[in-house]
Amino acid sequence: MHNKPVALVTGANQGIGLQIAKDLVAHGFTVLVGSRNLERGEAAAKQVGPDARALQLDVTDQASIAAAAERIRKELGRLDVLVNNAAISNTSKQPGMSVQQYAKLTRPSNVSLDEVRAVWETNVFGVLAVTQAMLPLLREAQAARIVNVSSGVGSLTRNSDPGYAYRSIFGPGYAASKTALNAMTVAMAIELEPTGIKVNAACPGYTKTNLNNYTGTRTVAEGAREPVRLALLPPGGPTGTFSNDDGPLPW
């Protein structure tokens, strides 16, 4: 059995996921850098350091997920932390198009169903598929943690408020996929509470990453802060919560 705690971060070859991997290694973890493209994952793992291992993982591909779980089982025997970070914001946004411009093309009245399905395939169904595959490994740990990287734009409470600044970009694609992810977080937390596995959702804030064409206002170090905190929760920590680094967020 591997001595160090083991973490898997999906979508960890760049952005917030890469920073989460770096931070968890700094806390003594062996980190599996999940990446659809193995070559990019290997390059990212080199950045993280000797305690990082690249792992080919496409969250929309059941065969890839199963192979990743089997490799972890054979090489490490368990999983202490799962960070479901992999996400896409769209499939059709043109280079240089602002978030606001894209939002106008993805209203409930005009959005392509193929676009919605593609975003949800990664952001919702991918999270469920990976979590299901990794649960046997998480159950082998003494106090496993699952962190779902969500977004405040998925908050129904906020979007129901006419004064909410980002209300205009709420739509069936990315934003609603994060609403669904929040619901899944609660469902997972309810089921797993008797096992001691804690499941929480983290909002990294508007972080400068490829997801938003690097238009965000926060650094990846700031964006990774809350997911890492939740990954390191002590035994008495909460489960079934939604928060950012300023505190709890409304569902």
Could you tell me what each predicted segment is?
Residues 1-32:
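Canonical Rossmann dinucleotide-binding motif of NAD(H)/NADP(H)-dependent dehydrogenases/reductases
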Residues 9-10, 84-85, 145-151, 198-203:
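Structural signature of the Rossmann-like NAD(P)-dependent dehydrogenase/reductase core
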Residues 27-43:
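Conserved glycine-rich Rossmann-like NAD(P)H-binding loop of the short-chain dehydrogenase/reductase
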Residues 38, 56-70:
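The beta1-alpha1 cofactor-binding region of Rossmann-like NAD(H)/NADP(H)-dependent oxidoreductases
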Residues 83, 130-134, 138, 184-185, ...:
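Hydrophobic positions on the long internal alpha-helix
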Residues 88-120, 139-194:
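Catalytic loop of short-chain dehydrogenase/reductase
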Residues 179, 194, 201-202, 209, ...:
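C-terminal helical subdomain
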